[in-house]
Amino acid sequence: MPSYRSILTVTTLAPGCRPEEVEQAARAVTRLESWDIAIASGQPRVTARFTAIDDAEARATHRQILSSVREIADVPRARLAAVVRGRSHYLAP
């Protein structure tokens, strides 16, 4: 089954929320292959890797992850990428 990445810039947490709840929110949507936290261009970025049958299912899962994480924190930017031979190829929304 193909792999995909939801790449989210995550900024301000909602009042009373803890940083680890961002990961919990993503994991509540689907089984994740991996989870990564990084700083990119001075902003916190999380990457949730998951599998899907095809691009359409991946887009639906990405939207669900984004919606779930937005209950915990502001997400000013989100992108979906297909993983092909270990490299990310961004998909149009």
Predicted region positions:
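Long, contiguous binding/interaction regions
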Residues: 1-93
